[in-house]
Amino acid sequence: MLIETQYLSNSKKLVVSYIDKTGDIKLKYYDWDNPMKYVACDDNDPLRHPDFKSWDGKHVKQIEVAQPDRYATYEFLDSLSDKEKNEIFEFHVPKIYFIDIETEITDTSGFPEAADVKDSDGNVTKEGTTTQVLSISIVYDDKIILLGLKEMPEDMQDRIIKNTNKYFEKYNTNYKLKYIKYEDEFDMMYAFFNKMVPKMACLTGWNFLNYDWLYLVNRSRKLKKWVNGKEYVIDPRVSSLTKKLNKVWSTEFEIPAHRMIFDYMQLYEICDTTIKIKESSKLEFVSNKLIGLEKIKYNGSLQKLYEDDFETFMYYNAVDSVLVQKIHDAKNYISIIYAISSLSRIKITDVLSKAKNNLGTLAITEGVLRHRFKDQMNAIIFKDDEKEG
């Protein structure tokens, strides 16, 4: 299943990422010396294509470009051997990790902002990511990994996993828990970005893109640590196989190239047909409606819970990630995205418009029809590929 493509103009290569039969991400590199794109031209242009025209009957020609557009890239992929195409486009389910963070709360107004708040003139009115990440929960298959900054004795770990399995007992769960304690926030975030994310094919969570992932990326850029006279920083670009973060147009967040990151709340909003009246998109409401379970209740503030009852705090963090996993197990919205990508033979990053909160209908239509366009000698012309769906 095709994830993404990236043209490296310096080396004249096309990088293609896809999911292999093991559910992991693999990269292929193809030589592409002179990428071309179609543009409209005059009837008497000597370079006009002898056969192809635009959908509205205009003559077209191909010109050399530094960066190929989406259609040119798909045309290149379609020209590969059947063996190569099958390997890239064949449907395989990626390994998926459900993630949730908890942050320090020092403001009575609630959770800290995940990004700077700006006025209409671009001036920062409230700084984002001002407080530290206290814990991260990661759920994969039957494994729960908790990252934290406090000691957690074995008996506490035993109670947390016992209570978690009891809370989800109707699913006959048998989760195993691993807790990793870090010296400080820097070490935790460094390990997350440098050692964990590179092993994850697909990351998701609830309101994950607009909060958790955004907070993690922005916060990581603020952290520094001196060890033996040397300053260390965290570069969130290491989360990408090609060390590149792509800014998603009209949003605050950036997505690592060649890695799948989805917001399961967005998938629910787009794909769910079970709840006729969507009164809320909060996890508490949706999990109750879809799987009959809610978030863990606690008294007082979440910050107070962290300070006074670390065990319940980490239990709460773990359950939040498991709730999203169980919504996925029950509804599997993400399989719709996988199927569209595989059937239409387009990048999975083109299936969803993360900015507009809907399906990327234009890209999907192009994928479904592009072979018909070719048979009918029609070329697709892009005017501004940066702002496509």
What is each PLM-predicted segment?
Residues 148-278:
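Conserved DEDDh/DEDDy metal-dependent 3′-5′ exonuclease domain
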Residues 101-105, 140-142, 209, 266-268, ...:
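Short, flexible loop/turn elements at secondary-structure junctions
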Residues 190, 194-198, 210-221, 266, ...:
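A broad, structural surface signal
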Residues 98, 203-207, 212, 261-263, ...:
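A structural signal for short, well-ordered beta-strand segments and their strand-loop junctions
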Residues 301-389:
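Common nucleic-acid-contacting/processivity interface regions adjacent to the catalytic cores
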Residues 54, 59, 93-97:
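Low-complexity, highly charged intrinsically disordered N-terminal segments
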Residues 3-9, 13-20, 25-44, 72-202, ...:
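Conserved RNase H-like, two-metal-ion catalytic cores of nucleic-acid enzymes
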Residues 271, 278-310:
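C-terminal or mid-to-C-terminal helical accessory/interaction module adjacent to the motor/catalytic core
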